[in-house]
Amino acid sequence: EPDFQDWLHKRLSGTSARWCQHLELEVTETLFQKVTPALQLTMQSLRQMGLTLAIDDFGTGHSSLARLHTLPFDKIKLDRLFVLELQAPMVRTIIRGMAHLAKEFERTLVVEGVETPEQQAQLVELGCPIQQGYLMQAPLPLAELLARPLR
């Protein structure tokens, strides 16, 4: 969306800058079919506003390893399909490799779709301590989330 940056800036303009640091914008791989200078500038501007940028569902769509160094992402969110195939030796190698690449590119790797303690332990063993999924917290309605005390 060409006007997204302006729209978001207007919405956040009355907000303390420190709150922007708690916002994470997840972008799916399909956005990167055509990387343009305008897209790169928009992403850079969003980061300058203090937002964290995450590439969501990495590894299953139109992603390319080249995107990891050409676009200003803070996080790489590895798709849950890798967790579903965690017992396959090649998948374990891919996950271990992604953990290494993320570290080398100074990006945070988040593995999505973790549902069991066994998966959690295996992923930690593969170098992926940051995880997301039903094991940690099921999705909540917004009203219930807002009613919870901050930790």
Language model feature labels by segment:
Residues 2, 22, 26-35, 51-151:
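EAL-family c-di-GMP phosphodiesterase catalytic domain
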Residues 7-15, 41-49, 93, 97:
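Catalytic-core regions built around general acid/base machinery
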Residues 8-20, 43, 69-72, 124:
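Acidic (Asp/Glu)-rich catalytic clusters
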